[in-house]
From Swiss-Prot:
Gene name linked to the record: yme2
UniProt protein name: Mitochondrial escape protein 2 homolog
Primary location group: mitochondrion
Keywords on record: Coiled coil, Membrane, Mitochondrion, Mitochondrion inner membrane, mRNA processing, RNA-binding, Transmembrane, Transmembrane helix
Gene3D superfamilies, per the entry: P-loop containing nucleotide triphosphate hydrolases
Family label: Belongs to the YME2 family.
Purpose: Plays a role in maintaining the mitochondrial genome. May have a dispensable role in early maturation of pre-rRNA.
Lineage: Eukaryota, Amoebozoa, Evosea, Eumycetozoa, Dictyostelia
Domain annotation RRM: ranges: 229-323
Organism the protein comes from: Dictyostelium discoideum
Residue stretches in coiled coil: 761-873
Subcellular location per the Swiss-Prot or TrEMBL entry: Mitochondrion inner membrane
Residues on Mitochondrial matrix side: 1-338
MF term (GO), any: RNA binding
Chain intervals for the UniProt region annotation (Disordered): 99-120
Amino acid sequence: MASPSSRLLKFITNGSKLHSAKNNNMIKNKNIISPTITKLFSTSKISNEIGNIRNFNNKISTNLINSNINTKPFFEIPKLFEKKYYSYIPPTWEEKDKEKQFNSITSTREEGGDNEESNRMGNGSIKDAIVWVNHLYPIKVSRLDFRSLFFHIPITKKLNSLFPNDVKIISIEKRIKEGGAYIHFQYDSSNPEYKSIEMVMSKLKSIFAQEKKHFHFASRPAKCKLVYGRPFVEDIDYRFPSTTLKITFKGSEMSPDDLFRLMRPYGHIKDIHYSSPIPSKDGPRQATITFKRMEGAIATRNCLHNKYFPEFNTSLYMDYEQLMRINKLKEQFSKHPKIMIPLLGILATLLTLLLFNPLREYFINKKLSSPCYFGEQEEDDWQERSEQKVLQTHFNFPPNSIVMISAPKGSGKSSLIDKVLENRINTLLIDCNQEVNNNDEEFIESFSKDIGFSPSYSLYSSFGSVIDAIIPTGKGAFHSTTNYQMQTILKLLDEVLAKKAKQFPVDPHQPYEYPLIVIDGFFGMIQAMESKEKANIIMDSVIQWAITSTQRGHAHVVFLSSDSFAGDIIKKYLDNRGGGQISTIQLGDVQPSMAINYIKKRIGPNTPITQHDMELVVDNLGGRYYDLNVLSQRMIAGDSVERALSNMISKAVSEIRAEGFGLSKRNDDSKIGGTKLKWSRPQLWETIKKIAENDFVSYDDLLFNVFLGDESSLNNLISSNLLRFQNVDNERKVTAYSPLYCSAFKQMVNDLEFNVGMDVLVQKARIEEELSKLSKVEDELLKIKNLTSKSWFEPLSIKKRRILLEDKLKDHVAKIEHRENILKKHSLFQKFLREEQMIQMELIKKQREQSKFERQQQQLLQQQQLQQQQQQQQQGSI
């Protein structure tokens, strides 16, 4: 086998050829390599070749440094051939193991031997030894510890300066993750100062103590210790230092006293523990030693590993006991979930109380103290309401009742409350948008964001998901309930408001900007929420908190809702709490003069509008802000007032047919699945006819004459945004949801075909009702007949009953006949309409055929004229 020097000369020769060829421009591409070197580096022995050459290079460099010759290494491996992952290069003191097949640094002979002789190697008076120097780098405790990447300052010169000139350094083996380095050196034992290794170490320790050199901003100076054993130099990625050493005895077992005396010089020991009290026959005994500092465990392992002690007839093998890692944590969770899960729950609670709650309280207070700003609003000039001044005055005095602002959609209730909140401190606006808050988690997240509750419970949900992934048995352990989350959020908000209440003026008549909490669209969101159980929990929590806050005088609470029954829901809660006050403000449409001013402002002076057009707008749209805005956009786009109103009314009719009568595919109660109407079509049609005749109809009239006492159907119809309540002269009246819908009702009634068709349904439904009543009367008469069939004389009481039933029978029969006559008239009218439609269709067909015939005649005439012209041209040419 060729020696390293001969292999080196061969490598240098090939490298010089490559270098000369490159200089002569023979190699123009850097990817082209000489065949000899390509063959050499393509073999599987490339790692060993580079390792041997680098080792030889290190020897030469060290000798040059010890000889104080300032020169570069005489050969460098080209970076072109270096691999990303370098091959393992054994330390210099292990080279003689390969050559002599035994360790001359540390003897592992179990026959005994001289300690001094076992810690040195060499021939004659030249001896070798190894020292461990600590505090050179920051100790790496995990793969995520990147501190060592910032400390690549060379330390070779500093270490060389700490060694005497007559002590030669052979190599320096850096151990970055252990924070130190091995230094392999030689000394002359014939020197009187270096007769023994102890004298050498005494001089080195005194030099290190005098110099007190700090490496890489270390808090302590570097120290050196003699290596007695055979160091285990490794580059395993997942093995890191720790404070605990696991010691394996190869041979006899050492007592705790001997272990303590042997290892105490390297650092303070916290505990010594043996694996089992009785020696095991199956394998070697083990001991665990825990040091107070990690430097002590590192020094002990690096100095005493694989050391043979003849007095104890044993060798010590040491390894680090790894710290608790993520996989160990997962194992603990999987094995002991009943202990670890409650423990983590307690830690999470403590973290919440000590860290999260103060942060949340700070952010809520910051959100509450910031003034509200909504930007410029275009409708500020035209929409001036008396309710605005009333609310501003009410909110500047101590709270004593919940405020309910009820108004249909598009009536401007949000813009009204925005004006009240503009530039006002101590204000929170909670927007319960139905499109965002489809379930309880989305609502709680949105609610937390609006009041400034941060960190929110979404962080807990993420943490719980991670735990669920780690622990299969811990499913749902870290997911708090909806009730708990709402109670926690509202309780913390109440604490912030209670602290604010300490700053209130003593005189209750003194104006002050008291805290104001506005909740917009809450009841609509509750109705649209998927889980009704959780929706009820959220509604109960919020309303109970609102009642408590107002009764304590901490804050004004305002609910904005388009639901006509929202006030009744809060009244039920107040009655259950023993009473309370609720101030209800019913907002209607704005005055016609304000509506005209808004239209003029929106369309601008360039779009003319007549007085007749203004009257049409007021009659059909009233003062509904949303509809006025749509009309102004259509007028700006170029539509006339009549055309825009016609399109809007037609669209409203389509919406009523779809939502009210279910005359669309999406509301069709079919097998595919659709929403079933909570009222009957005849009930809605009769209501529409009454409202089209009179804009306002008594609630009781509809309840008893149209819905026949079915209050749930009437209330569902009102909640569907087709109808609405309005108090007129202290009487509850029912009208269309908007003036536009009222115009749509009138158009539907004026549509004869639709009117007759719906009236047919109404008459059939009424006939069925009369028939069911008639059937009951007939059954009763049969029972009376059976009672009197066996006697000659009819009792007076039974006779009166029979006469009453006969009168009812006649009345029902008369009603049925009347409605049947109406149906006959309707059927004749429908037949007439069908005939008219057929006649119109035939006329249209004849007109089309006539126009087609005329077009054909014109084409023939044109062809004849063209032929005549061609003939005349031919004759003229002849």
